[in-house]
Amino acid sequence: MRALHVPAAGDKPQLGEIPTPDAAEGTVVIRVKAAGLNPIDNAVAAGMLVHMGLPHEYPLVIGRDAAGVVEAVGAGVDHVSVGDEVLGHVLLAPPISAGTLAEYAVLPAVAVTRKPAGLDFATAAALPLAGAAAVQSVDAIDPQPGQTVLVNGASGG
């Protein structure tokens, strides 16, 4: 499959062919229809994982967010099925190698949900990290009915 990836330590990202991922236990493989970009993607491409000493593997595919169609599900995955339209993100859980700027992406099942029918793939791909940040922020302050909440700097994850 084609993917934007870092082939080896010290290399710059390049578009090229890498093996298509398989679904392992607790994962979902999607055919990517759209992928979102976040500041973390540039940092990963620039070598952040190396500088932070985070375990990772090559080829290292760039990208965290995506929307697409389920191609395969691993054992233990029962909330989505082959053919479902979904959105999700790749967790930064070591060893890091998976990404979403590719024809196919393998995502942890816990980070995948069905795409609402009225939402296009491009919009859906922009939601996972930024949307999770928004939900976590609201959950953290636990607003009550009648309270006012100011959203400042809603620029995403």
What spans do the regions from the language model cover?
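Glycine-rich beta-strand-centered segment in the early N-terminal region that forms part
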Residues: 19-37, 49-93
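A local structural motif
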Residues: 10-17
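Cytochrome P450 core scaffold surrounding the K-helix E-X-X-R motif
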Residues: 40-46
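NAD(P)H dinucleotide-binding glycine-rich loop of Rossmann-like/cofactor-binding domains
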Residues: 79, 88-152
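Conserved glycine-rich cofactor-binding loop
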Residues: 155
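Conserved beta-strand elements of the Class I
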Residues: 4, 28-29, 150
